[in-house]
């Protein structure tokens, strides 16, 4: 049995969403298995004395433009037509990431993760609003929140 690969994720990261959308194909093609590990990306940035690319490159327009270009290329290559930048970005994901841990304990993490990523990066919902998060869950996940 192959050692699983940890996929550290935060729903607030568009890059994590993009990775999530292609991991299934990688698993099918290679036989690898990814274990999803919820983290708070903002906390990781703080711990490592780092900043998000949006903040780090705010004063470097060409770098931000190239980052967006690469994102568009990735989206096109992998046919991720539903992806859209969230108008509420950046979003405080503390609550929905805590629920990701609970969803793992309850055995409904894959469905919860799909719903949260869809709400955040396909539907452009304000996932910082607890009621919107709860409504998103009620639509598709057997998780009482």
Per-segment meaning from a language model:
Residues 132-144:
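Residue-level detector of conserved catalytic or cofactor/ligand-binding positions
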Residues 18-120:
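Structural alpha/beta surface segment adjacent to cysteine/selenocysteine redox centers
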Residues 1, 144-145:
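Residue positions that mark polypeptide boundaries
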């Amino acid at each position: 049995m192959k050692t699983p690969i940890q996929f550290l994720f935060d729903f607030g990261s568009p890059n994590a969403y993009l990775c999530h959308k292609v991991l299934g194909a990688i698993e099918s093609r290679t036989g690898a298995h990814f274990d999803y590990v919820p983290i708070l990306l903002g906390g990781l940035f703080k711990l490592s004395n780092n900043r998000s690319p949006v903040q780090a490159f705010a004063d470097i327009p060409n770098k931000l433009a190239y980052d967006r270009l690469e994102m568009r290329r990735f989206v096109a290559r992998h046919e991720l037509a539903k992806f859209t930048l969230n108008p509420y970005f950046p979003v405080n994901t503390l609550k929905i990431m805590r629920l990701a841990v609970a969803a793992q304990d309850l055995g409904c993490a894959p469905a919860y993760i799909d719903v949260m990523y869809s709400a955040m990066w396909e539907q452009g919902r304000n996932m910082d609003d607890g009621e919107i998060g709860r409504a998103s869950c009620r639509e598709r996940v057997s998780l009482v929140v």
